């Protein structure tokens, strides 16, 4: 039986076990891509969505400037410049599938994962850092890894310098 005897006894979630697995978590309303990776089995409420997949390459793409640009093209804009990346709109995003037979794509994929792992580590360090100078140093390393991921994503999507400029101006402007 999946519901209780009284109205306040809500039925159990059919996908509880998905919360225990590695997954990508993101808020249901956001201004820019804010995706994180969970390996600790965090549970979320209705204010967040989860993507039940252990895929740090996808996490790197989702937080990239190119994905931010795609937000502007595919997602409806809410008041205040916010977006609601629900599945209905998100399912049409052109996420690059890696051809592992192509050495350049495999290398870019592996580099993205390396930088995502570094970013996850650096963000943990930043949370624990009390010294302003150390925090600034970590922030610079974070910015460097984010930029490396952006360049790798541009490479995978074979963007021209003009297209890269368009993306950069759109999300930085």
Language-model features, listed with the residues they occupy:
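Polybasic, glycine- and aromatic-enriched phosphate-binding surface used to engage nucleic acids
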Residues: 1-104
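Non-catalytic DNA-recognition/assembly elements of restriction-modification systems
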Residues: 95-173
